Amino acid sequence: MPVVDISAAEIGIYSLSGDTKNPTPNIEFNLNSFRDPLGNLHLRRTCVDGKDPAVQEWIKVDPRFEPILNQCIILAKDATQGGTKWFSIGFRDHHGTWISRAVATLISNELATLGFKVGVLHAKGQD
């Protein structure tokens, strides 16, 4: 199933910056400990934000990514099998432009591949 418009989703995925107040997700992951793509000169020069596939591939190597993905799959299954009509997961990092957008995009694509009706909202980053 492809990622859908956020208004048609049963699971909302949000990328958030340090100062984003809304939306407020049901569950939020703090990604500040992830390695920062801005530290990679090639990515910084060739990519615009975390929605770029090169940034996403770089983020997937971080040892924190796979456990978060697995936890999100469990949360999505629990929410939808429990009859919840709406459930949201947020990913926050300082800038909200690189790490959180990459993780939100990767997680939403994986959940959609598993058949969940997922929508993504990328909040305005600080960059």
Put a short name on every predicted segment.
Residues 108-118:
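Post-Walker A helix-loop "phosphate-sensing" segment adjacent to the P-loop in P-loop NTPases
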Residues 3-5, 86, 114:
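Catalytic phosphate/metal-binding cores of nucleic-acid and nucleotide-processing enzymes, i.e., regions
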Residues 116-127:
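Short beta-strand-centered segment that lines the nucleotide-binding/catalytic pocket of NTP-utilizing
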Residues 2-50:
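Glycine-rich, flexible N-terminal cofactor/catalytic loop recognition
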Residues 82-110:
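Catalytic cysteine-centered active loop of the rhodanese-like fold, especially the PTP/DSP P-loop
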Residues 26, 83-87, 116:
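Short coil/turn segments at beta-strand junctions that form active-site/ligand-binding loops
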Residues 39-87:
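Helix-loop module immediately N-terminal to the HCX5R catalytic loop
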